[in-house]
Amino acid sequence: AEETSMIISIDRWVLRQACQQIQTWNQMYSPDPALSVNVNISAKHIVSQELREFLIEVLTETGLEPDSLKLEITEFSIVDHSDITAAAFTRLKELGVQIQIDDFGIGYSSLGYLSNFPINALKIDRSFVNDIIEDTGQRDIVEAIIALTKRLNVQVIAEGVETPEQLAKLRELGCKLGQGFFLSTPLDGPHAEQLITQIKFGTGMLPALEPKEN
């Protein structure tokens, strides 16, 4: 589907469903801050002239605040599609949606695009997080990426956090956001709603939010 126009139809279906579900939960539970949703989007769709209009339609239809929608595009897609330009990203940022670079660090690309593209966050590829405890080289790369995001004033998110040791090391290096099986396994709608309810009423917490032991 990635190589055909079918991917745009798939992207649109996922975007609409995700925005509708997140806004439903925001209205039901009034979390503070409001829930946001990350949606992976194809390079073919990013450069589409119709994407901006479609997002306006979906955000208006669902009532979701634009900054609650975070579009993810892989670094490899940026490298592999020279027609992805800063202008394409700017068209989306003007709506108020956020843009995140997924799988950062494995694209073998020039870092020049980081200063030219209006992005909100970098997501450190899981391949660097996997060996962050044993491999000092990988740890140095993660630390360098974190330092880079601070200089660029964008968020940094670690992918593939699967152990408490990895989480502790990432915290030590200054990374405050992460995703992975240690934090939560993938959840379907009912189980995600149950977790939202537990967190709202103080009966459940994610590992990343639990207070550290003294």
Q: Over which residues does each language-model region extend?
A:
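Small residues (Ala/Gly/Ser/Thr
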Residues: A1, A18, G178-G180
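Catalytic core of bacterial c-di-GMP phosphodiesterases, primarily the EAL and HD-GYP domains
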Residues: M6-T85, G160
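Regular, well-ordered alpha-helical segments
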Residues: Q23-Q27, E94, E172
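EAL-family c-di-GMP phosphodiesterase catalytic domain
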Residues: N40-Q49, S68-D83, L95-N214
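Conserved functional hotspot residues or short segments at active or partner-binding sites
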Residues: A88
